């Protein structure tokens, strides 16, 4: 007598296909966003930057005229719009992850159906985290690289480009945006598991992401030792508006750093007398110069990835406790 044995198909590929089918429209929207923003960034770095270059040369040539009107093109407006788009991406991810990635399946019973068909809750969650994480990392990394390419258009072509330390430009030009998307994914996933209702999970996910990412930005300048420069009154605040500033003020005779006293006088000499009455001998500025850009980016990215790992671990703990 011969015995026939039937081997069940692996659950993991089946779950991956099911996840793809369930969230295919989200994938279509994400790919469309990435392609559209990528095209606009390339347009800004090429034709728009060239138009701005021609306009700035015209402005340089007609400076001797009493009146000079030059159209500088759409580079600045387009760049600003695309920078805002990149900054908003993590919050869009949080809204989607909170509303549909876990909460909708728990609310509709789709998750329970999968668990009764031989798919463990842990594997179910692992697939739903892994596939979006890969897609988000690839797409966000491409957008960050193209944004930096558009920003690095030579200054003589585009006029005054946004300085590197402006908050939105700082994050859109580096890996913190990619890490923020992953953090938002983890926030939405955990929120969906806790709330289990689509619309409330959406709102809570976005609010929690705002708090977490805002907190990371606030901590960012404190993750590395800043530089302090001191100079005489006549030279103004040294290093001001050249980097990420933490503080500026007066240097006293004892070497202490104090806030600059308020001065409403119309002349600098009058203000200097007020400063000297407070024991001031010069100005100081504590800031992060351009050489600190990548250390700040990498430490902030590492912080966000640690938070992402903790949120992901918390998601598995919550799921295990609720499913026994």
Region annotations inferred by a language model:
Residues 25-62, 85-95, 204-216:
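Hydrophobic alpha-helical transmembrane segments of multi-pass membrane transport/permease proteins
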Residues 97-117:
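Transmembrane helix boundary and interhelical loop/hinge segments in multi-pass membrane proteins
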Residues 204-265:
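Aromatic-rich transmembrane-lumenal/periplasmic boundary elements in polytopic membrane proteins
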Residues 23-30, 86-89, 121-148:
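Selective transmembrane-helix segments that form parts of the transport pathway or gating/packing helices
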Residues 6, 35-42, 73, 80-83, ...:
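Secretory targeting signals
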């Amino acid at each position: 007598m011969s015995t026939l044995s039937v081997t069940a198909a692996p659950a993991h590929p089946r779950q991956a296909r099911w996840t793809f089918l369930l969230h295919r429209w989200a994938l279509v929207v994400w790919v469309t966003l990435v392609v559209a923003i990528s095209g606009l960034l390339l347009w800004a770095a090429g034709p728009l930057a060239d138009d701005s270059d021609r306009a700035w040369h015209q402005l340089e040539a007609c400076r001797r005229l009493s009146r000079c009107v030059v159209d500088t093109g759409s580079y600045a407006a387009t760049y600003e719009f695309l920078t805002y788009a990149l900054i908003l991406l993590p919050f869009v991810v949080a809204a989607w992850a909170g509303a549909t990635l876990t909460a909708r399946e728990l609310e509709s019973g789709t998750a329970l159906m999968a668990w009764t068909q031989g798919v463990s809750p842990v594997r179910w969650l692992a697939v739903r985290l892994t596939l979006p994480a890969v897609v988000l990392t690839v797409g966000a990394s491409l957008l960050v690289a193209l944004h930096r390419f558009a920003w690095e258009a030579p200054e003589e072509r585009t006029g005054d480009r946004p300085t590197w330390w402006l908050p939105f430009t700082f994050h859109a030009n580096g890996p913190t945006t990619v890490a923020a998307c992953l953090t938002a994914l983890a926030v939405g996933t955990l929120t969906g598991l806790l709330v289990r209702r689509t619309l409330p999970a959406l709102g809570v996910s976005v609010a929690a992401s705002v708090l977490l990412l805002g907190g990371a930005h606030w901590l960012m300048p404190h993750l590395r030792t800043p530089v302090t420069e001191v100079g005489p009154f006549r030279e103004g605040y040294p290093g001001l508006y050249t980097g990420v500033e933490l503080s500026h003020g007066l240097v006293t005779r004892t070497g202490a750093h104090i806030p600059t006293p308020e001065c409403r006088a119309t002349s600098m000499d009058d203000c200097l007398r007020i400063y000297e009455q407070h024991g001031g001998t010069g100005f100081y500025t504590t800031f992060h110069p351009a050489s600190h850009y990548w250390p700040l980016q990498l430490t902030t990215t590492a912080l966000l990835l640690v938070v992402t790992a903790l949120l992901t671990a918390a998601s598995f703990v919550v799921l295990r406790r609720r499913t026994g």
